[in-house]
């Protein structure tokens, strides 16, 4: 059993949900970047639903098993992956946040669970480098392929570094 409290994970997810909603509204309404607004909100509100369910679970148990914590963090990685797919892939400045569940896992969960979450994060990061809905910035905007490769490599290296460093 790990030492992480379910309530802490729920609070962190509420902060993420609030930040995601704020970012989507700001980008769509104030910066006027055309993103899949409704679809993005659907993905975010899935997190709201899961967090309400987690809150009900927390009323029964304050602590969470390693396996449930693993699934909790896996959901966060997948949810952010889908949101990044809708909003520009890894060139989205918020793509770095995909590291947060890996950091949490490395801090609290057994190594094999962190390795699995790291591998899934790396797979999602790699997929998002090639497949995503581009941001419609109004004019032609392309980053050089070498930049995309560098960003991909830096995110992958960071995931690996976090996973290894936590267990040294």
Regions found by a protein language model. Name each.
Residues 1-5:
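Short, Lys/Arg-rich, polar N-terminal cytosolic tail immediately upstream
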Residues 6, 18, 22-44, 61-69, ...:
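Alpha-helical transmembrane segments and their interfaces in multipass membrane proteins
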Residues 17-21, 74-79:
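Core segments of transmembrane alpha-helices
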Residues 21-25, 52, 81-85, 103-104, ...:
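Alpha-helical transmembrane segments of multipass membrane proteins
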Residues 44-49, 74-78, 93-101, 149-157:
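Membrane-embedded alpha-helical segments of multi-pass membrane proteins
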Residues 47-62:
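Canonical alpha-helical transmembrane segments
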Residues 78-90, 96-116:
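Generic transmembrane alpha-helix motif of multi-pass integral membrane proteins
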């Amino acid at each position: 059993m790990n030492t992480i409290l379910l309530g802490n994970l729920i609070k962190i997810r509420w902060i993420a949900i609030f930040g995601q909603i704020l970012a989507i509204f700001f980008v769509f309404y104030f910066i006027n970047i055309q993103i899949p607004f409704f679809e993005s909100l659907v993905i975010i509100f899935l997190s709201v639903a899961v967090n309400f369910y987690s809150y009900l679970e927390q009323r029964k148990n304050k602590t969470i098993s390693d396996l449930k914590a693993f699934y909790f963090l896996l959901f966060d990685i997948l949810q952010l992956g889908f949101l990044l797919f809708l909003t520009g892939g890894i060139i989205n400045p918020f793509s770095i946040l995909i590291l947060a569940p890996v950091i949490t896992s490395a801090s609290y969960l057994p190594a094999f669970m962190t390795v699995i979450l790291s591998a899934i994060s790396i797979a999602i990061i790699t997929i998002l480098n090639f497949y995503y809905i581009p941001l419609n910035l109004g004019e032609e905007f392309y980053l050089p392929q070498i930049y995309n490769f560098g960003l991909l490599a830096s995110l992958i290296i960071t995931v690996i570094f976090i996973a290894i460093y936590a267990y040294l």
